[in-house]
UniProtKB/Swiss-Prot annotation:
This is 9-cis-epoxycarotenoid dioxygenase 1, chloroplastic. It comes from Zea mays. Expressed in leaves, roots and embryos. Keywords: Abscisic acid biosynthesis, Chloroplast, Dioxygenase, Iron, Metal-binding, Oxidoreductase, Plastid, Stress response, Transit peptide. Residues 1-27 are annotated as: Disordered. The N-terminal amphipathic alpha-helix (81-100) is essential, but not sufficient, for the thylakoid membrane targeting. Has a 11,12(11',12') 9-cis epoxycarotenoid cleavage activity. Catalyzes the first step of abscisic-acid biosynthesis from carotenoids. Not active on the all-trans isomers of violaxanthin and neoxanthin. Contributes probably to abscisic acid synthesis for the induction of seed dormancy. Induction: By drought stress. Residues 1-23 form a transit peptide. It catalyses: a 9-cis-epoxycarotenoid + O2 = a 12'-apo-carotenal + 2-cis,4-trans-xanthoxin; 9-cis-violaxanthin + O2 = (3S,5R,6S)-5,6-epoxy-3-hydroxy-5,6-dihydro-12'-apo-beta-caroten-12'-al + 2-cis,4-trans-xanthoxin; 9'-cis-neoxanthin + O2 = (3S,5R,6R)-3,5-dihydroxy-6,7-didehydro-5,6-dihydro-12'-apo-beta-caroten-12'-al + 2-cis,4-trans-xanthoxin. It holds the Pfam family RPE65.
């Protein structure tokens, strides 16, 4: 990760070997002022930014602390301390001693952490977690919120509940949803709550983190040891992985009366927005027993049919990839098993009016690399990247057409459509290089280039072009198009300006046909996240103008230590209103807007 703040004379990488320290210090720098500007009421009870040798012994104390003066609402699902029999108490003590004496002291502490697994890097400044916040009402507003905006802006993100005891990647944190209710031109309420996953409930009952962190911990021999330790605890009945191991921290989608919080390592979780603006986790959601596998965090809701299209990938056993969809009433299609030679990281995909577009890129899973001391997430340079084009209602994968797109890795795809004039499928995504830099340390500068990719399924040929001219090239990541036009040709995309990486200094409106770029910049020392486009008429299949709507986004002021919600006119990119939030909102991942009608139609 590159320069997050002006250089300082204090290195946070003192514990790393000299070579790693030099690399990390050149690529990640933090300002003490930015960290100390966090309001003291929200600071963690234990220091978070420690060398691995100084990381705490297994913590009995959650990292996320409620804000004084605002008592946290009771958690119905918490269930208290886990009751253990004599054998389990002995096994727990022995396994804890093995973790501290061998895994931590022998396998981990003699080695430095890469920046991609260093808590001092991954959860510093406004990436650090916050405590839960019960609803706060009647928030101050500057400017005018358009009265048509009626609903809840909800945004997901990673917010570790416990202090890390080993490596930690930003993607490893527990899911927390931040929700802002807007109605009649007023900001009625704000709340943030953990999504009460089975993983989080079990760790709270035990009083410490025990589930493996997929990116931060599972590398090398120590990763194998931590996996073995986890399954030993499961064999002793100390944890139950069958109840779910995911963190539900990435995506949000509203479908069939339910707001679903998702990460690709588990089933979705149903989160309900209460009448007072609070958030309640209903539970792990398997679509009434129809879904028995994990689902990626970016399912696609077709605005015309109401169908929800999804993928599921498996890193251990075949089939490594499956496609399925849900009809508007929630009934599930049969799985289409897509044959892949090796398990592949597929974080996102795209739909058109009639097709599903599936990336098969070079970032793959090779668990055997852990035996060699490496990460199981690997850039396979011998593999040729490709996209698969499959009819939405295909009976099996025999209808899939593959098109090679060499050296292309799109972590996110913003839209796709069918070009009737050429017969090609047009895909809009951000091509990232180095492809594995999010997961593995790299000396190269990360670039995320907004790209138009054209796939000709008849000939197997592809072309690609950068949407922006070289003189205007900026890193564009996380964002969306008008959701009423998803899968159809769109002119505009609203994307975060991810500079200086990994912070977001503003967002851009991009004309996908001309490359014209219009930026909305947050200002010095102010950073945000994903822009959420809210169309003027949420149900309009053909709006008056594609950009007829507003953009909502959270922004944090590092100097003042305050956070806000901005409301920006999507057509002219002018600020309409600012909502002052009662507490800090960390940088997060993806969000959605739930309309007032959808709130009223929520399932119990």
């Amino acid at each position: 990760m590159q320069g997050l703040a002006p250089p300082t004379s204090v290195s946070i990488h003192r514990h790393l070997p000299a070579r790693s320290r030099a690399r990390a210090s050149n690529s990640v720098r933090f300002s003490p002022r930015a960290v100390s500007s966090v309001p003291p009421a929200e600071c963690l009870q234990a220091p978070f930014h420690k060398p691995v040798a100084d990381l705490p012994a297994p913590s009995r104390k959650p990292a996320a602390i409620a804000v004084p003066g605002h008592a946290a609402a009771p958690r119905k699902a918490e269930g208290g301390k886990k009751q253990l029999n004599l054998f389990q108490r002995a096994a727990a003590a022995a396994l804890d001693a093995f973790e501290e004496g061998f895994v931590a002291n022998v396998l981990e502490r003699p080695h430095g952490l890469p920046s991609t697994a260093d808590p001092a890097v991954q959860i510093a400044g406004n990436f650090a977690p916050v405590g839960e916040r019960p609803p706060v009402h009647e928030l101050p507003v500057s400017g005018r919120i358009p009265p048509f905006i009626d609903g809840v802006y909800a945004r997901n993100g990673a917010n570790p509940c416990f202090d890390p005891v080993a490596g930690h990647h930003l993607f490893d944190g527990d899911g927390m949803v931040h929700a802002l209710r807007i109605r009649n031109g007023a900001a009625e309420s704000y709340a943030c709550r953990f999504t009460e996953t089975a993983r989080l409930r079990q760790e709270r009952a035990i009083g410490r983190p025990v589930f493996p962190k997929a990116i931060g911990e599972l590398h090398g021999h120590s990763g194998i040891a931590r996996l073995a330790l986890f399954y030993a605890r499961a064999a002793c009945g100390l944890v139950d992985p069958s109840a779910g191991t995911g963190v539900a921290n990435a995506g949000l989608v509203y479908f069939n009366g339910r707001l679903l919080a998702m990460s690709e390592d588990d089933l979705p979780y149903h989160v309900r927005v209460a009448d007072d603006g609070d958030l309640e986790t209903v539970g792990r959601y398997d679509f009434d027993g129809q879904l028995g596998c994990a689902m990626i965090a970016h399912p696609k809701l077709d605005p015309a049919t109401g169908e929800l299209h999804a993928l599921s990938y498996d890193v251990i056993k075949r089939p490594y990839l499956k496609y399925f969809y849900f009809r508007p009433d929630g009934t599930k299609s049969d799985d289409v098993e897509i044959p892949l030679e090796q398990p592949t990281m597929i974080h996102d995909f795209a739909i058109t009016e009639n097709l599903v577009v599936v990336p098969d890129h070079q970032v793959v899973f090779k668990l055997q690399e852990m035996l060699r001391g490496g990460s199981p997430v690997v850039l396979d340079k011998e593999k040729t990247s490709r996209f698969g084009v499959l009819p939405k209602h295909a009976a099996d994968a025999s209808e899939m057409a593959w098109v090679d797109v060499p050296d292309c890795f799109c972590f996110h795809l913003w839209n796709a459509w069918e070009d009737e004039a050429t017969g090609e499928v047009v895909v809009i995504g951000s091509c990232m290089t180095p492809a594995d830099s999010i997961f593995n340390e790299s000396d190269e500068r990360l670039e995320s280039v907004l790209t138009e990719i054209r796939l000709d399924a008849r000939t197997g040929r592809s072309t690609r072009r950068a949407v922006l001219p070289p003189s205007q090239q900026v890193n564009l990541e996380v964002g969306m198009v008008n959701r009423n036009l998803l899968g159809r040709e769109t002119r505009y995309a609203y994307l975060a300006v991810a500079e200086p990486w990994p912070k977001v200094s503003g967002f851009a409106k991009v004309d996908l046909s001309t490359g014209e770029l219009t930026k909305f910049e947050y200002g010095e020392g102010r950073f945000g996240g994903e822009p959420c486009f809210v169309p003027m008429d949420p149900a309009a299949a053909h709006p008056r103008g594609e950009d007829d709507g507003y953009v909502l986004t959270f922004v944090h002021d590092e100097r003042a230590g305050t956070s806000e919600l901005l409301v920006v006119n999507a057509a002219d990119m002018r600020l309409e209103a600012t909502v002052q939030l009662p507490s800090r909102v960390p940088f997060g991942f993806h969000g959605t807007f739930i309309t007032g009608q959808e709130l009223e139609a929520q399932a119990a």
